[in-house]
Design a protein with these regions (language model features):
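C-terminal non-catalytic scaffold/interaction domains in large multidomain proteins
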Residues: 1-137
Length: 137
């Protein structure tokens, strides 16, 4: 009923948006920068905090331990974990993931933490093993 009263507007992701209005965050340069460097993401220097919060809320950007990743980087990390587990079914180490991702421990640990928390991997002592949501390699 509200949209009838407001005329040319639709509800998208819980927000009222005028029809024909471009999404100002659709092609945000920070998301592009994160996607261009998936495993060594840049810091959000100069990114408006409100825009950053909205990008995280929408799922375009994932924050883990203060590091921001493109959603596509998380998917890529899950595929990398699957490939590592194809080679080492008993589990892979943090070091193996870090070397395969070409990044540092600073960026590896938040990625692995996210994969563990979403069921892609599970931590067993010093290795990561397949979780129930591990994708195909």
């Amino acid at each position: 009923a509200v949209t009838i009263l407001l005329g040319d507007a639709v509800v998208e992701a819980g927000r009222l948006v005028p029809i024909g209005m471009a999404d100002p965050l659709a092609d945000h340069p920070f998301v592009a920068a994160l996607a261009a460097s998936p495993f060594v993401p840049p810091a959000p220097d100069g990114v408006d905090r409100g825009e950053l919060r909205e990008l995280v809320r929408r799922g375009d950007v994932i924050e883990e331990e203060g590091i921001f990743y493109a959603a596509s980087a998380i998917e890529e990390a899950a595929r990398l974990a699957a490939r590592l587990l194809d080679d080492e079914p008993e589990g892979f180490t943090v070091s193996a993931f870090r070397e395969a991702a070409g990044n540092t421990r600073k960026h590896t640990m938040p990625l692995l933490s996210h994969l563990d928390s979403t069921g892609v991997t599970r931590r067993r002592e010093d290795v990561r093993i397949a979780g129930p949501r591990l994708p195909d390699a």
